[in-house]
Amino acid sequence: MTTVIEELARRLPDIDPSSWARRFELGGVYLGGRETTPDSPITTSCRLEYYDPLYPIDKADEYFPAFRSEMILLMDEDIGVAWKPAGLPTTAPRDQRLYNFQRYLTEHLKRPVHLPSRLDTGVAGLLLFSLSPRMNRHLQKAYDKKLIEKHYIAEVVGDFTPEKVEIRSELARDPRHPILRRVVSAGGESAHTVVQKIDAYKRVETSYSLLQVEPLTGRTHQIRVHLAAEGFPIVGDPFYNGAMAPELRLISYALRLYHPYKRTMMTVELPRSAWPDWLVERVNLSGPFSISYREEKRHEGCSIS
């Protein structure tokens, strides 16, 4: 009977045989939809999948951002807020299982960590996590009821108008690629995003707008697709025709939610020490900005049982 490693070597002869041990260590090999080992036997009914990494496997430690304890900004026995750097997956992707923020947090804290929402790999910023089953349940209900505010900062080319807009549409997979999304007239998932212009400014001869963006639903690439559909793709977003830049200029900047066990509102903003260079440059050009939060009455009923 053929084994997984024998079949991979037969089908992928261009891959150095000596590299397979490291490739299995990283992950990315699946048999029947589950991670597998080199010596696992293959039956005729099993599907074998291999996801080739897009980075040098011998330099993965350099490719992905490293974890530092100061990335945890606040934490109690139930909940925490951390800063995830751009370039690090929130959870394990299909091509590898070693380098992701959830794994780093779990290993650092030596306890299970639940992530009620995720950030795209290219997005930096605040990430909420829970540490107890009771908080897991609360956060899930709070997200379902849209009681957790997540505010992003985005930079786009041009003078964004109107000053504030609510975007509602349906999003579905783009047939060109399984990761991409697009706006559809019917048959997709409903998506709702509130966009407010913070400032307009120029770098050299190009006009830019700084936007505060609050997604009220949590669809894949929701902010990126909605802004692109409005004619203002995010700077540094090659997936949706954004202007060229070395990074995606979208960050998770602020969180606001009710802590049910301390009976208080939590408001967390990204500390300046974690700001990307493009945001620091903008503040140096135009001065400080502030986030507009929802009215307090919008948070009535936050104590979910």
Regions found by a protein language model. Name each.
Residues 1-305:
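RNA pseudouridine synthases
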